[in-house]
A protein has these predicted regions:
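Divalent metal-dependent hydrolysis catalytic cores, especially in the metallo-beta-lactamase
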Residues: 106-129, 144-153, 173-184, 209, ...
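Metal-associated gating/positioning segment near the N- to mid-region
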Residues: 74-138, 218-230
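Alpha-helix-loop-beta-strand connector modules within alpha/beta enzyme cores
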Residues: 136-152, 191-212, 252-257
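Acidic, glycine-enriched loop/beta-strand segments at the rims
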Residues: 32-44, 57-58, 318, 346, ...
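Bacterial N-terminal signal peptides that target proteins for export
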Residues: 1-10
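Histidine-rich, glycine-flanked metal-binding segment
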Residues: 32, 36-77, 96
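Acidic/histidine-rich helix-loop elements
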Residues: 87-103, 155-160, 183-191, 304-312
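Active-site neighborhoods of metal-dependent hydrolases
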Residues: 164-187, 237-361
């Protein structure tokens, strides 16, 4: 579990609730999925200001004067929490920090997340001043996803490099740090062990949790043993073993599978199956669908080195799915994540695709939903602040027209999104 020194920023928006707007709203008659695994048929959720004040059965008393929202036949659950996403220097299928890592573009991305029901995003890397500023404004956000940031990803080879970079990023006051221990399938230089060990030590000395990007089981085990607080990607080279499982469960370290990240490395070799899906199109930037259908672009990709790597990641995806099922069965807490934000990893849409892929990997719809709500918040040390429908939590609500427990794709049947007690979409 990650616990950050800046958790008070996350709590601030809760304490401001009464002053902001004290309207009381009761959602009645719907199926309540509370983010912990509990279901209440025909339940009641009461919101006052920015926070939830009561959750219970139909008999739950409704305060006098409350506005009643009848959601019979619908499902209400917490806004989804992405434990590993990004706000990025991306526009369409282009990436350019100088042009695109701007406040207006980041706000647009956070609004896109929110339109798809993702109301909190932990951006794990490449975060700069505009991202930090938006994080600091979470208390007033009602039309975009809440944002937490890790700052620049820490790299290096020597202990001095790892320690210095960790200290430099920590001085920016991020919510956590992130290291990258990967060689991109032997095409890049991996972060040196002295550097990542020093970075972990420095993070903990500054009371900051640290997430680790890995690919190989050996690196996952080594960084976990050294104190990593979140395994931010799937192990993709081989089956996980008992020692790794024990390391995760003994320290209650969470594991973020990011299955759609692997999918994005090869799926554009042909036209992706969702390119004309209205649910995808509602968040797609102009021109993107046409580019994804462009045969010449696909042909150029298939002739590239990136495509060759994608074929290896395609095989890694199958390993990742099996490992996800194994880890969940063995009691490891799963932190829903997508690594969305870079080109081709579509914010909002990919989160729903990730849920579908998690269920295809063997999780139940409820297990996937808990990973994407209560457990995602818990894995970042923020239980009770958001991600669950409980007294005192942020009134971030996702209302669906149908039942996602019957078919996980029903998360796409979005009726409304509420953020901090206000209807946003």
């Amino acid at each position: 579990m990650l616990v950050s020194r800046s958790a008070h920023l996350a709590a601030l928006f809760l304490t401001l609730s009464g002053a902001a707007h004290a309207q009381t709203t009761a959602f009645v008659g719907g199926r309540v999925i509370d983010g912990t695994g509990r279901v209440i048929e025909r339940g009641t959720v009461i919101v006052s200001g920015r926070t939830i004040t009561a959750v219970g059965p139909a008999s739950t008393p409704i305060p006098q004067g409350a506005t009643q929202v009848h959601i019979d036949g619908k499902t209400i659950l917490p806004g989804l929490v992405n434990a590993h996403g990004h706000v990025a220097a991306t526009s369409g299928l282009e990436s350019d920090p100088a042009r695109f890592y701007t406040r207006p573009n980041l706000v647009r991305q956070l609004q896109t997340y929110a339109k798809y029901g993702i109301t909190t995003v932990f951006s794990l890397g490449d975060d700069d001043i505009p991202g930090f500023q938006l994080r600091d404004e979470n208390a007033s956000a009602t039309d975009r996803a809440r944002l937490f940031v890790a700052g620049p990803v820490i790299n290096g080879q020597t202990a001095a490099e790892g320690r210095t970079m960790a200290a430099t990023v920590a001085a920016m006051k991020p919510d956590l740090l992130k290291i990258r221990v990967d060689d991109n399938l032997k095409t890049a230089v991996k972060m040196g062990e002295p550097a990542w060990r020093a970075a972990i030590e420095e993070a903990h000395a500054r009371k900051l949790p640290i997430a680790v990007h890995i690919f190989y089981l050996a690196d996952a085990k080594a960084t976990l043993a050294a104190g990593a607080d979140l395994i931010a990607h799937s192990v993709r080279d081989t089956a996980v073993d008992a020692a790794f499982i024990a390391g995760l469960t003994s320290r209650q370290v969470c594991y973020s599978p990011t299955l759609t990240r692997e999918l994005s490395t090869f799926v554009y070799e042909t036209t992706p199956p969702w390119v004309e899906d209205p649910f995808f199109l509602k968040g797609a930037e102009p021109g993107v669908p046409a580019l994804l259908k462009d045969a010449s672009r696909q042909q150029a990709f298939r002739a590239s080195d990136a495509w060759k790597l994608g074929q290896q990641y395609k095989a890694g995806l199958e390993v990742a799915k099996k490992n996800l099922k194994t880890l969940k069965d063995q009691g490891v807490r799963i932190a829903f994540g997508t690594d969305s934000g870079p080109p081709g990893r579509f914010q909002g849409f990919f989160e729903h695709l990730e849920l579908e892929m998690m269920v295809q990997a063997g999780l139940t719809p409820m297990q996937a939903l808990v990973a994407a709500t209560g457990d995602a918040a818990r894995c970042h040390g923020r239980s009770g602040q958001f991600g669950t429908l409980e007294k005192g939590a942020a009134a971030d609500l996702l209302i669906l027209r149908t039942n996602p427990l019957e078919d996980i794709r029903n998360t796409r049947a979005i009726d409304a999104v509420w953020i901090a007690g206000r209807k946003a979409y």
